[in-house]
Swiss-Prot record:
The gene is fhs. HAMAP family: FTHFS. Pathway: One-carbon metabolism; tetrahydrofolate interconversion. The lineage of its organism: Bacteria, Pseudomonadati, Pseudomonadota, Alphaproteobacteria, Rhodobacterales. This is Formate--tetrahydrofolate ligase. CDD domains: FTHFS. ATP binds at residues 67-74. It comes from Cereibacter sphaeroides (strain ATCC 17025 / ATH 2.4.3).
């Protein structure tokens, strides 16, 4: 059989007009705003009309700590949605939009892979419906209005040394992390130090993903703290009168995007915060809409369960009042071997001993998910290099942790390769879920960070200097103490050191910086060396992406 790349499989898909996909969910064509023939936005009016409908079951797909290439979490999300439909269940998937940064960097796209993809794959991995452009524009409009306000007299008394709002762009570019703006003389303004973050780390992105409707969106935008006066009192976005214009830029972006899988099942793709430097979940409005339209909604949270799942439970579910019915932890033989000490270039060779060592990582994630009171099953995402002995070792280990591990071949076989997992998920979803967040709202902010570090990462302590602790206390005094925390750290390890694999115990978590996302409604703790503006690798994926002689894209995966 001839090997087909993801892009070749996606191009060969027999896509249906998006109106037919909408009709399957009961969405009238008049409530779809089409972007071409195969993607559309769903109108706010239609979504408002769903309020009184009962909710379906919410299924989270998460994973172990990944290799740099990822472990097929989105592929499994898509495959599981297709699998549930295959066994006669009405299912919808909800995933995030792709960022250009990793597309042209090292990780690749975010549309799934093989026979478990969302299409149109090329559009999704590039500009899609323009949501990221709108988010970037809204964010940078506020940035421009801050410097403009200072230029024209600074009536609000903003201290240029204490402006916390940076700029963003949807690209990995380490050169923009720190810079001085307004150089060039009096006509250009007052020089000050600032920098860029990647769009997926923007508070505007988080706000769009957590807002319930346009009114809530504008309220949250107005609540953004852009900086402080000399007396340390905050200056808000609404003080600059930027919130209305920002909401206008985001009006269409707030409408969820409807597309389809290769097997013509519906998929909402909306929002895209990273899980290592942001909260890592698709939009609340897309998830809630899907829950009103389907019996089962399958969604994913970025990277491993220590990041994406924890934030899904402690931020998204807490804020939106969602109650997941079951969780799937995706594991691959190769990632378990890497966690057991095998070098990346040797992952294709059988090594049961290393795999068993690496299974401690899987066990930690299973225990963490169970700690939230959610039933869990393990999906072994099959790779051609996996051996029967390795697969059986994973099954045996998971069984010892009280979770069934099911081999899934959805990448190669689509929904036919994941039926067993689909049936298990239905079974789990019928059992009582005792979901509860990790910590109460009233716990002090630093204690929340300690709770995540100790219970999820198994750290011994959290290191933060007096400046950070004083800042957290000041935010508590200002009324932000009930907010959840968003831990920004490497995705490759339970520690803040990407090189430490497995399931380490007793390490320290250093907090380098804290940021208040008052509009989004959480406090970010930046741990270790993680950056909110990534850089490109030595050999970025962009080097092999091109147009062929027929004007078709090559190299996008």
């Amino acid at each position: 059989m001839t090997f087909q790349s993801d892009i070749e499989i996606a191009r060969a898909a027999n896509k249906l007009p998006i109106q037919e996909i909408g009709a399957r969910l009961g969405i009238p064509s008049g409530d779809l705003i089409p972007y071409g023939h195969d993607k559309a936005k769903v109108s706010q009016g239609f979504i408002r009309g769903l309020a009184d409908r009962p909710d379906g079951k919410l299924i989270l797909v998460t994973a172990i700590n990944p290799t740099p290439a990822g472990e097929g979490k989105t592929t499994t999300t898509v495959g599981l949605g297709d699998g549930l439909n295959r066994i006669g269940k009405r299912a919808v998937i909800c995933i995030r939009e792709a960022s250009l940064g990793p597309n042209f960097g090292m990780k690749g796209g975010a549309a799934g892979g093989g026979r478990s993809q969302v299409v149109p794959m090329e559009d999704m991995n590039l500009h899609f419906t323009g949501d990221f452009h709108a988010i970037t524009s809204a964010h940078n409009l506020l940035s421009a209005m801050i410097d403009n306000h200072i230029y024209w007299g600074n009536d609000l008394g903003l201290d240029a040394r204490r402006i916390t709002w940076r700029r963003v762009m949807d690209m990995n570019d380490r050169a923009l992390r720190d810079m001085v703006v307004n150089l060039g003389g009096v006509s250009n303004g007052f020089p000050r130090q600032t920098g860029f973050d990647i769009t997926v780390a923007s508070e505007v992105m988080a706000i769009l993903c957590l807002a319930e409707d346009l009114e809530d969106l504008e309220r949250r935008l107005g609540g953004i703290v852009v900086g402080y006066r000399r007396d340390r009192s905050p200056v808000f976005c609404r003080d600059l009168k930027a919130d209305g214009a920002m909401a206008v830029l985001l009006k269409d972006a707030m409408q969820p995007n409807l597309v389809q899988t290769i097997e013509n099942n519906p998929a909402f793709v909306h929002g895209g915060p990273f899980a290592n430097i942001a909260h890592g979940c698709n939009s609340v409005i897309a998830t809630r809409t899907a829950l009103k339209l389907a019996d089962y909604v399958v969604t994913e949270a970025g990277f491993g369960a220590d990041l994406g799942a924890e934030k899904f439970f402690d931020i998204k579910c807490r804020k939106a009042g969602l109650k997941p019915s079951a969780a799937v932890v995706v594991a691959t033989v190769r990632a378990l071997k890497m966690n057991g000490g095998v070098a990346r270039e040797d992952l294709g060779r059988e090594d049961v001993a290393a795999l068993k060592r690496g299974c401690a990582n899987l066990g930690r994630h299973i225990a963490n998910v169970k700690g939230f009171g959610v039933p869990v099953v393990v999906a072994i995402n099959h790779f051609t290099t996996d051996t029967e002995a390795e697969i059986e070792a994973v099954r045996a280990y998971a069984a010892g942790q009280g979770a069934e591990a099911i081999l899934c071949r959805h990448w190669a076989d689509g929904s036919a390769g994941i039926e067993d997992l689909a049936r298990k998920v239905v079974q789990l979803a019928e059992t009582p879920s005792m979901f509860a967040p990790l910590y109460p709202d009233e716990m002090p902010l630093f204690e929340k960070m300690e709770t995540v570090a100790r219970r999820i990462y198994h750290a011994h302590d959290v290191i933060a200097d007096h400046v950070i602790r004083d800042q957290l206390r000041a935010w508590e005094d200002a009324g932000y103490g009930a907010l959840p925390v968003c831990m920004a750290k490497t995705q490759y390890s339970f520690t803040t050191d990407a090189a430490i694999r497995g399931a380490p115990e007793g390490h320290s978590v250093p907090i380098r910086e804290v940021r208040l996302s008052a509009g989004a409604g959480f406090v970010v703790a930046i741990c270790g060396e993680i950056r909110t503006m990534p850089g490109l690798p030595r050999e970025p994926a962009a080097e092999v992406i091109r147009l062929n002689g027929e004007g078709r894209i090559e190299g996008l995966f």
